[in-house]
Amino acid sequence: CSSDLADYRNWVPKRLLAAIFCCFLAALGVAGITGRMSQGGWRTALLWIFVLLSLFFMVLFIWMSCLYRAFDYKGSRRMSAQIIDGIAARVEIPEEGRGLDIGCGSGALAIACAKRNPAAEILGVDRWGVDYGSFSKGLCERNAAAEGTGNVTFRQGDACRLDFPDESFDAVFSNYVYHNIPGRDRQEILLET
């Protein structure tokens, strides 16, 4: 159960939804302009290309909107909250143990594990870059304060190059991370973890 003051954000950015919708409108507009031209030859082909393109963007917008609703932490679907709570329920760290959340994003999983393991220290690491610009170390720290967890800290880190000695943590957990690392051997990344 999370505080109403915490802001865990959504893994589907509103900017992405807006960009897809703008692409839909642009393709629809070009299709409309092309449709007003005299028909025949390349103009008909161009019309169909932009009609199909606008349909593609419309379907993509609907699909991404459904994902946005599903991954809304505080919304009616609450899939994110169910996933976070489900993972945290399985993380058991011994007293004075250490846990590591790789790719912590907004801190939701690290904070949930810290709340379930109050005698342990939890560290959340993320690279917090342009790809997920709405997430940051500051956001994680504000969320931890809103949830009243004093046993969780956050720092910049990379899932591909973790700078910790082997066996530094009693538990390592993650959520929505490894599939976002392009062009890497997943087994190699998991072994690094």
Which residues does each PLM region occupy?
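Short, small-residue-biased leader/transition segments that mark boundaries at the very start
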Residues: 1-2
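Class I SAM-dependent methyltransferase Rossmann-like catalytic core
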Residues: 12-18, 62-83
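Conserved alpha-helix/loop element of class I SAM-dependent methyltransferases that forms part
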Residues: 78-96
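Conserved class I S-adenosyl-L-methionine
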Residues: 95-105, 123
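Conserved SAM-binding loop of SAM-dependent methyltransferases across substrates and taxa
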Residues: 106-118
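Conserved SAM-binding strand-loop segment of SAM-dependent methyltransferases
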Residues: 148-159
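A short acidic, Gly/Pro-enriched loop at the edge of an enzyme's catalytic core
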Residues: 160-171
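A short, conserved alpha-helix within the catalytic core of class I
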Residues: 181-192
